[in-house]
Amino acid sequence: RLVDGEGPNLLLLHGLGEATPEAPPTQVAQSWQGPIYGLDFTGHGDSSIPRGGGYTSETLVADADAALRHVGSAVLVGRGLGAYVALLLAGLRSAQVPGVVLSDGPGIAGGGTEPGSPSIVAPAEQWAGTPDPWALTDLATDVRPQDYAQAFARFVLTAHPNRHPLWVCAHVRPPWLEAVVDEAGVLEGSIPDALTDLERDLA
């Protein structure tokens, strides 16, 4: 837990190669009154490093799902790679995720919408800490089909038909995120606007 508070929980999901900050970003801290939590994805920050890579966005969704079970329910704020993970988790666990905010950050584009040419990449083995080079390699090329992202956006929107649970606060918009924005009911704006609106709805 990064910050105590009174009200709904908020869970921060960081970008590719990053870790949970010691304190939440100012625009988050000033816009949210409830407790704020953070999570280090596998291969990042203080989390464990598996041998030989094999990272996928779905692997990180499992990390975030475990954190969500710990806190019970939470609004998700995803940055970069964390935005994509947040969207998937919000679609899978809509009863526990009343809102999700997608923002810019490292790894937001992923590996495009279709698989590329097969290749084998061997990161430098002398690096022993985090971020795991395998995580950087695998997740930077993780495929993100537009229809896949749209499906999860629809799960979020249909689970909360009387509110606006899905906000896009990113300037960089790869194809998967453009597909999300095209869905009716998705709102665009700043992170403070999104959090203020979500917290008001949940009061």
Residue positions per predicted region:
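Conserved catalytic-core motifs of eukaryotic protein kinase domains, centered on the activation segment
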Residues: 22-24, 47-53, 112-113
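Conserved hydrolase catalytic core segment
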Residues: 73-110
